[in-house]
Every structure is written in C-alpha cells, then in structure tokens.
C-alpha cells in the first residue's frame, strides 16, 4: 500500500458511525520533515515548525508556553502522551500528532468532528505503523 493510500483510506475516511464526518487535513511526515503523503488540504509547514514538534516529543512540555504552530496556525497544546502524542486546540477544531519510529501522523479537524474522534483515527494508524516497525 502506498503512503498516500494510508492518508486517503485511513485518515481522510469517514469517522466510524458518522458518515460524511472526516478530518479536515492529514499527513504522514518523516522525522526529517520529508512529507511521505498528505491530503490536498494539509498546510505548507515551515522547517522550524516541524523542529518544534520534534523537540516537544523529545522534551515534553517544550511547546506549552508558545503553542504548536503548523502552517502559520497556532494551536494551544493540551494534554497528550509524553513522547508519543501531541494534541492541540484552536477554536472549534484542533490537531493530533502521533509519533511512530520513523514518522509523525497528523490529523487536523473542525466541528462536527470531535477531538476524541480525531485522536482515535490518528492514533489507530500510528499504533498500526508502530506494530509494523515503522
């Protein structure tokens, strides 16, 4: 399966039990900031934004004072899982980022998708990739 198929079929799919509810944007990005696959709506990010995200995985709490920035959008960092998941909130939407051995799985959502639904979709794919040694 191509990386794009993972984004299209596992991240941008309908949320279980909620036909038509999908993540706004999604991507799989390598630890080196190379984009493996992304939805057409995924924001163009700056290298320093990705560096900040990687630093927060290695030093949990790094982004809390400044917020998480992606594509120029600022998210307030909310409770995640140290070294494994970063979650952010902005208005009625937000972001979930799951770290795997080689990549970061991104999901961005807006209402009616809930934070929990975004977490489920992103973390399920991230956990699968971890199980595959990726």
UniProtKB/Swiss-Prot annotation:
Range of residues in the leader sequence: none
Gene3D superfamilies: Dynein light chain 2a, cytoplasmic
A Pfam entry, by short name: Profilin
Subunit structure: Occurs in many kinds of cells as a complex with monomeric actin in a 1:1 ratio.
Other known facts: The variability of the residues taking part of IgE-binding epitopes might be responsible of the difference in cross-reactivity among olive pollen cultivars, and between distantly related pollen species, leading to a variable range of allergy reactions among atopic patients.
Keywords: Actin-binding, Allergen, Cytoplasm, Cytoskeleton, Disulfide bond, Phosphoprotein
Species in which this protein is naturally found: Olea europaea
GO cellular component, one term: cell cortex
Protein task: Binds to actin and affects the structure of the cytoskeleton. At high concentrations, profilin prevents the polymerization of actin, whereas it enhances it at low concentrations.
UniProt short sequence motif Involved in PIP2 interaction, positions renumbered to this chain: 84-100
Family note: Belongs to the profilin family.
Principal subcellular localization: cytoplasm
InterPro entries linked to this entry: PFN, PFN_euk, PFN_sf, Profilin_CS
Protein name as annotated: Profilin-2
Modified-residue entries (Phosphothreonine), positions: 114
Cysteines engaged in disulfide bonds, as pairs: 13-118
PTM (free text): Phosphorylated by MAP kinases.
Claim: Chaperone is one of the keywords in the record: no
PROSITE patterns, alphabetized: PROFILIN (PS00414)
GO terms assigned for molecular function: actin monomer binding
Subcellular location: Cytoplasm, Cytoskeleton
């Amino acid at each position: 399966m191509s990386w794009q198929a993972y984004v299209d079929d596992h991240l941008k799919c309908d949320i279980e039990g909620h036909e038509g509810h999908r993540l706004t944007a999604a991507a799989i990005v390598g630890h080196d900031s190379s984009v493996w696959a992304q939805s057409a709506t995924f924001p163009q990010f700056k290298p320093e934004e990705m560096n900040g995200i990687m630093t927060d995985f290695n030093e949990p709490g790094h982004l809390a004072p400044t917020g998480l920035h992606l594509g120029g959008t600022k998210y307030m960092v909310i409770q995640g899982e140290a070294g494994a998941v970063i979650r952010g909130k902005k208005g009625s939407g937000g972001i979930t980022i799951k770290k795997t051995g080689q990549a970061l799985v991104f999901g961005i959502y807006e209402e009616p998708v809930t934070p929990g639904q975004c977490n489920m979709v992103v973390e399920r794919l991230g956990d699968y990739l971890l199980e595959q040694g990726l």
